[in-house]
Amino acid sequence: TTIIIIITLIIFISLHFQGVSFMKVLFYRYGSICEPDILSYFNALGITVIEEKTELYNKKFSSSPECVNKINVLLSIHSPLFVFTINFFPVIAEMCHIHNVMYLCWTVDCPILELFDKSIQYPTNRIFLFDQGQYEYFSPYNPNCIFYLPLAANVERFNYAIQKITKQEKINYTTDISFVGSLYSEKNPIRQLNNLSEYARGYIDSIVESSLQIYGYNFIEESLSDKFIEEFKKTNIVFSNERLISNSERHAIAHQYIGHQIAETERI
């Protein structure tokens, strides 16, 4: 199926199977809907999977010292061939670099603020980005370790589900066009900025409205004035400059914040 071919491709690109006959991997999970399918196909490939699932119920775990300690212990005890995550986690990239263990990840969201972290530059990374624009922006920071790889689907699971539905269910759910995905309202970071000034809010609203009239061209970043950037930073958003790749404040504001606002507006 599509997904098993792509997972196999990921492993070959990353490791080249240099005489490896036994594979043990650490799968750091946070609750992505893509994780169960990836996990099932890792198992189908005969890979022994150690799952770290604390973040399933503690969403702040990856930013805590406890996470560093837990990953350190797991890497020391199990010595996995590689660590895998859906999306990119800087803390895992750091720990894998320290232990000289390969870190594989596959993005399923865009934008991802964590990709702006300098840890994407480690040679132990194998970062697969599903969005071409995302790939074109980040690949120069680690050209030998960042790859473009579109999303895949578990065709077998979906075919099985389709075969099992009743005639009435088919009538209820058959449409010419379907949208399955997040509305982004639950993950829009601008909603959390209670102290955003009227000037900044109006500026963002005008960009959002303009973007709805133009298809196929992303002009957000070039539309941000220096004055707006400084005004936006007054919300006390933390841009840890020593951890950012180059000067990416403008890109982060454009895509991580305003981009989410546009996505929510478009989908609702």
Predicted segments, located by residue:
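Nucleotide-sugar donor-binding catalytic core of glycosyltransferases
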Residues: 19, 24-34, 144-145, 150-268
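Short, Lys/Arg-enriched N-terminal segments with co-localized hydrophobic residues
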Residues: 1-22
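Extended catalytic core of nucleotide-activated donor transferases of GT-like folds
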Residues: 29-140, 157-160
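Low-complexity, compositionally biased segments
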Residues: 7, 19, 46, 72-75, ...
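Generic secretory/membrane-interface signal
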Residues: 1-4, 47, 125, 170
